[in-house]
Amino acid sequence: MGSSEQELKAIVKDLGCGPYFLGTYDKRFPGFVSPHKLACAIVNTAGRETGGVHWMAFAWNPHSKTCYLFEPFGFSDQRLKQVYQFEYESLLRRSAIASSPDRCITLEKSTQSVQGPNSAACGLFCCMFLHAFANWPQTPMDHNPTMNLITGVPNSMLNSPQVQPTLRRNQEQLYSFLERHSPYFRSHSAQIRSATSFCHLKNM
């Protein structure tokens, strides 16, 4: 089941990302068009008409001309295309053309897995990343108090029994973080935890 757009918007607002948050989008996200403003969004790999498949977060720092792509499994571009039929090149081209005079931007992409293979918490991990971006836009991926709460593992080991305790701890840290910072999450904790549980996809 995972997270609904309504839930993600409410949590992101609680986390103080409102001034920069453009919204939740399906795979047709148009990219970042403002040349001077910090901006971020949560984007699904599928069309809205499908009900959605997997959430990722995009963020734009105009000062460093850097576009961040946070994808909780840390899949390669090839794997994203293989698993979700998702490509983001056109999004980057549109962002570069609109937001950078020389049409040149840097892409920084997550490459490690922080989410368990059967977890449905991708949207919640995206909210956590956007909190890091809103507070530490120069280093949102790591080396900040928010993302330091979780530990990445090599994507090649995503399904390895060896790393499942680490990935489970990540999800527990995620829930604890949201309990502390999001009144919406606290009010709907049982429902959200059930819909995003560590073994949710395995039990479907």
UniProtKB/Swiss-Prot annotation:
Reaction(s) this enzyme catalyzes, per UniProt: Cleaves proteins of the adenovirus and its host cell at two consensus sites: -Yaa-Xaa-Gly-Gly-|-Xaa- and -Yaa-Xaa-Gly-Xaa-|-Gly- (in which Yaa is Met, Ile or Leu, and Xaa is any amino acid)
Active site per UniProt: H54, E71, C122
GO BP annotation list: proteolysis
EC number: 3.4.22.39
Keywords: Autocatalytic cleavage, Disulfide bond, DNA-binding, Host nucleus, Hydrolase, Late protein, Protease, Thiol protease, Virion
Top-rank taxon, per record: Viruses
One cellular-component annotation, GO: virion component
Enzyme superclass (EC): hydrolase
Main location, first listed in the record: virion
Something else known: All late proteins expressed from the major late promoter are produced by alternative splicing and alternative polyadenylation of the same gene giving rise to non-overlapping ORFs. A leader sequence is present in the N-terminus of all these mRNAs and is recognized by the viral shutoff protein to provide expression although conventional translation via ribosome scanning from the cap has been shut off in the host cell.
Family statement: Belongs to the peptidase C5 family.
Function: Cleaves viral precursor proteins (pTP, pIIIa, pVI, pVII, pVIII, and pX) inside newly assembled particles giving rise to mature virions. Protease complexed to its cofactor slides along the viral DNA to specifically locate and cleave the viral precursors. Mature virions have a weakened organization compared to the unmature virions, thereby facilitating subsequent uncoating. Without maturation, the particle lacks infectivity and is unable to uncoat. Late in adenovirus infection, in the cytoplasm, may participate in the cytoskeleton destruction. Cleaves host cell cytoskeletal keratins K7 and K18.
Name of the protein this chain belongs to: Protease
Organism: Human adenovirus C serotype 5 (HAdV-5)
Gene encoding the protein: L3
